[in-house]
From Swiss-Prot:
InterPro entries in the cross-refs: Big_2 (IPR003343), Class_I_gatase-like (IPR029062), Ig-like_fold (IPR013783), Invasin/intimin_cell_adhesion (IPR008964)
Protein species of origin: Clostridium acetobutylicum (strain ATCC 824 / DSM 792 / JCM 1419 / IAM 19013 / LMG 5710 / NBRC 13948 / NRRL B-527 / VKM B-1787 / 2291 / W)
Signal peptide location: 1-29
Protein name as catalogued: Uncharacterized protein CA_P0160
Gene3D superfamilies with a match to the protein in the record: 2.60.40.1080, Immunoglobulins
Protein keywords: Plasmid, Signal
């Protein structure tokens, strides 16, 4: 029994142990067998939403058998975006927010998504809704997408007509041809949100650039003018032509410091040094060589060659052998004086032809006759000159352009001159050298001849050249000098006057010289306000190329004004359309009032013009097929053009004239202090010709500016504002300038005057301006253009303050004098004169009693005035035989005329009914009346085609007819 009980107890204990072990296992399973999350991943790490949009994120917890996959959602900024516990995000406002999902099983894992919240654009705005560009110009359009925090800011640019206006992806537009295109910017969000700009491609006008060149060639360059012209064309003119520059070369002046070459084997007629001495007396130096030295002598260093008469036969033989060299030198711009009397004391005889001349040997002339007087050449000579063989021959052949001064007994020339290429030949067969040292009728002649031929020189010193160029109004002015002589010229005190001339014209000086003279020449350029450039002349081709580049650099800096022009401007139309364009012009004799800040004027609207020149013939509102490039009469012009039969745009421009500055300036020495007082006055006489009468005491001038600087040799000064003050020391040179501004804002050319405190007389300065380079003349009415009474403004002055006397001469193209007076010529001088160019010359002196020293005379100052015709309207004329009302029997006879004799090129017929409605229009053919019935008005206009002038339409002519035709 006990054994059985023991066995039961054992089994009970085993059962209890197993039961306890099972409970332990359950507890262990509860605490050690749960699966934790190892990672959490969101469906997005970045998200973009618009305001009020929603999106749902999902969170994946791994591993798949994780005991607890629950997550908790949160937002870093609940004001920007909210998130619920299902991961649904709601965008509340623009911004950036972080949405986070975190595990719930205690594993402390999380994952985040960055959400950027934006909003849709609601508008797009361009910087321009309308743009107007001339052909070839560019502009930038910019697009502003609103609101600024919009989701999409990129835009796409398009153009409605890429042949008219192009546009790139950045909004850069370019005008290609006349017309209009719509340029559109669209937001790239697929909603067709866009904005547009209407771009009109117009004919915005611009001034054609003008350049005037004065070129001086120093003979030290050892180059003849013909070769130099070729280089000038290659390196300078070609660049001007290629850029469509309106240019002139005023002159190509070859010069040297007064040096003559005498070629002789011995003095003529035992005259000793007479020829040499006479040349020296004229301020020239001479070199003397024999004929056999011609081949080894560089001729280009001389301005003149003098060949005396009476040489041995070997001399003339040698002369013939060097003929080609002498001919090339003369054609290149030299002056050759050939005293051709042979068979004298030395028995030589020249034969054949020499520079276009032949003569009859041994044709001795005891008498010669003066047939053309000259104040220098024939001074103190009798009309009929006799002597022992006054001439040793006559010229039997000579160039047709010769000017003959004297003839022999066969009425053949014995004294003549003629142009030969770019040079000049003066030849004569008198025994001048003999009578220069012996008595007789010819005694004065050699002195006269040398003085005449030396002063006749084709070249002048650099200083003289700069004093006399004729510049065109509104051009850029350039002086180009090549050579090494100038370095000495610019050291002279007279250069103060030259600087005044350069400043008056704002001229640029390009000095091509030896590097040894660089500092001197650069100093001169600096005195010219730096307007210029020094170039080393060791490589002439390279130097001229640099000069051309410099000129183009200056011209390319010139400012262009789109709506303000001067009467002398040439106007470019910047269009390149292949389509037909018609033009129409109207004009008012007034100017636009721009209400500029500097215009202290109470007037409103447009300002009427004083001294207007009337309405331009072409400004009649008629449509024409050619554009007008020159507006010779001031006023406000409206320019319209039709493109594909539609009026595209009107351009309104002002055409005016520059104001004119006036002042008087001189110095006077104080007797006590010895200092010099400076008197500057009369600036209130300055005026603007467009407003001088209607603007009270101002005379159209709203601003004025005085400046001065010292230009004494060795002094480098800059401009000082205001008038030159008194109390100046002696022996100083100054230039003073005045500029004035008119109501339109146009500044005048500077009026510059030279003032000196030197106790010596200075020659007065002759100078005047002209209101226009051309004067229209109505030849039908034998009258000048309206408003052209005063065409010149006198600007002459004397640096010492002396009173001046004036001498005015007007000559025609043939050298005939049409006016000679001490008074300035007016327009009436030119009434009834032939069309063409006239030279107006002024010379002054300070006589009879200047303050210091003897009376001095100014250099002559010359401007050219061109008389041009006025085109008159053609006259429309036709007759109608309306005896019959049947269309086929109505006869129309047209017989229009033009008062100037110009060809009529267009005839426009218009037929209107009794209500004014146009029913027929034809061009250059009679209207067909066959389909008409009733009362009609026939109107004819005709257009002329003058040469070199704008074409004009006639006034319309109308006639009424009755037609009984189709019903």
């Amino acid at each position: 029994m006990k054994k059985k009980l023991k066995s039961v107890l054992i089994w009970f204990l085993i059962f209890t142990f197993n039961l306890s072990l099972g409970s332990f296992r359950e507890v262990f399973a509860d605490n050690n067998d749960a699966v934790l999350a190892t990672a959490i991943t969101l469906s997005k790490n970045e998200d973009k939403l618009l305001v009020n949009q929603t999106d749902t994120l999902t969170a994946v917890v791994t591993p798949d058998n994780a005991s607890n996959k629950g997550v908790t959602w949160s937002s870093s900024d609940t004001n920007t975006a909210a998130v619920d516990q299902n991961g649904k995000i709601t965008a509340l406002k623009v911004g950036t927010v972080t949405i986070t999902a975190a595990t719930q099983d205690g594993s402390n894992l999380s994952s985040s998504c960055t959400v950027s919240i934006t909003r849709l654009a609601n508008s797009i705005v361009l910087n321009k809704m309308v743009d107007k560009l001339p052909v070839g110009q560019t502009d930038l359009l910019t697009a502003l997408v609103r609101p600024l925090d919009s989701a999409v800011k990129d835009v796409t640019w398009t153009t409605s007509d890429p042949s008219v206006v192009s546009v790139d992806d950045k909004g850069n537009i370019k005008a290609l041809k006349l017309g209009m295109a719509v340029v559109t910017a669209a937001v790239n969000d697929g909603r067709n949100l866009h904005a547009s700009c209407n771009v009109y491609v117009t004919n915005l006008l611009s001034k054609r650039k003008k350049a005037d060149l004065v070129v001086t060639l120093d003979n030290s360059m050892n180059i003849d003018k013909t070769t130099f012209k070729d280089k000038l064309n290659k390196y300078i003119e070609s660049k001007l032509k290629g850029s469509n520059i309106d240019y002139t070369i005023q002159s190509i002046q070859g010069y040297k410091s007064k040096k003559v070459l005498i070629i002789q084997d011995q003095p003529a007629w035992e005259s000793g040094t007479k020829v040499y001495d006479d040349i020296k007396q004229e301020g020239y130096t001479s070199d003397v060589i024999t004929a056999n030295q011609i081949s080894s002598t560089e001729l280009t260093q001389y301005s003149h060659i003098y060949i005396p008469s009476d040489q041995a036969q070997s001399f003339y033989d040698e002369l013939n052998q060097n003929y080609s060299k002498l001919e090339a030198w003369t054609k290149g711009g030299g002056i050759l004086i050939f005293n051709a009397a042979d068979e004298g004391h030395h028995s030589g005889q020249w034969q054949g032809s020499f520079l276009g001349l032949t003569h009859t040997p041994s044709d001795f002339q005891p008498t010669i006759t003066i047939v053309k007087q000259d104040p220098i050449l024939t001074a103190n000579l009798k009309t009929t000159i006799t002597g022992n063989y006054a001439a040793h021959s006559q010229f039997t052949s000579y160039p047709s352009n010769s000017i003959i001064f004297a003839v022999g007994n066969k009425n053949l020339p014995t004294i003549l001159e003629y142009r030969y290429g770019d040079g000049l030949v003066f030849a004569q067969t008198t025994t001048a050298e003999f009578y220069a040292t012996n008595s007789g009728d010819l005694s004065p002649y050699l002195d006269n001849e040398i003085k005449y031929t030396i002063q006749k020189t084709l070249g002048r010193s650099f200083s003289d050249i700069l004093k006399k160029p004729t510049w065109r109004e509104n051009s850029e002015k350039f002086v180009i000098n090549l050579g090494d002589t100038l370095a000495n010229d610019v050291k002279e005190n007279s250069m103060a006057q030259t600087l005044a001339e350069l400043e008056s014209n704002k001229a640029y000086v390009t000095l091509i010289g030896n590097n040894n003279n660089k500092d001197t020449l650069n100093s001169f350029i600096n005195k010219n306000d730096g307007r210029g450039m020094f170039i080393d002349n060791s490589d002439l081709d390279g130097a001229l190329s640099k000069a051309g580049d410099y000129i183009m650099t200056v011209l390319n800096k010139e400012e262009q004004n789109s709506n303000m022009f001067l009467t002398d401007d040439y106007i470019n139309y910047n269009e390149s359309s292949s389509e037909d364009v018609s033009w129409s012009y109207t004009q008012d004799c007034k100017h636009l009032n721009y209400d500029n800040d500097f215009v202290n004027c109470s007037k409103t609207g447009d300002i009427a013009l004083d001294n207007d020149l009337g309405i331009s013939d072409f400004a009649n509102g008629q449509w024409v097929n050619n554009e007008i490039n020159e507006f010779k009469k001031p006023g406000k012009y409206t320019i319209a053009y039709k493109f594909k039969d539609n009026a595209i745009v009107n351009e309104t421009v002002n055409v005016n004239r520059k104001p004119t500055p006036i002042f008087t300036a001189y110095t006077a020495q104080d007797a006590v202090s010895g200092k010099y007082d400076v008197v500057i006055k009369d600036e209130d006489k300055s005026y603007d010709i467009d407003h001088e009468n209607s603007d009270g005491d101002r005379k159209g001038i709203v601003n004025s500016k005085f400046q001065w600087k010292e230009v004494t040799q060795g002094v480098n000064d800059t401009w000082h504002d205001g008038k030159l003050p008194s109390g100046q020391d002696s022996n100083k040179d100054f230039i003073v300038k005045l500029e004035v501004q008119d109501l339109e804002g146009q500044w005048s050319n500077p009026l510059v005057k030279y003032i000196t405190t030197r106790n010596s007389n200075v020659a007065p300065h002759a100078q005047f301006t002209e209101s226009a380079e051309e004067m229209p003349v109505d030849q039908l009415n034998n009258d000048a253009s309206v408003g052209m009474d005063a065409i010149f403004t006198d600007e002459s002055y004397d640096a010492n303050g002396d009173s001046i006397r004036e001498h005015w001469i007007v000559t025609d193209n043939n050298g005939n004098t049409i006016y000679d007076s001490t008074s300035m010529p007016k327009a009436s001088v030119f009434v009834g004169k032939p069309l063409g160019t006239y030279n107006v010359t002024l010379t002054c002196d300070d006589g009879p009693t200047p303050k210091v020293g003897a009376m001095l005379t100014s250099d002559s100052y010359t401007l050219q005035l061109k008389l041009v015709p006025i085109n008159h309207k053609p006259v429309a004329k036709f007759e109608v035989d309306n005896t019959s009302k049947v269309p086929a029997d109505i006869k129309i006879t047209e017989d229009s005329t033009d008062p100037d004799g110009d060809k009529i090129t267009e005839k426009d017929w218009t037929v209107t009914d009794d209500k004014g409605k146009v029913v027929l229009q034809t061009e250059n053919k009679l209207p067909d009346l066959s389909n008409l019935n009733g009362s009609y008005t026939i109107t004819l206009k005709v257009k002329d085609s003058p040469v070199g002038l704008p074409e004009l339409w006639s006034d319309p002519l109308s006639k009424t007819i009755i037609v009984e035709g189709a019903k």
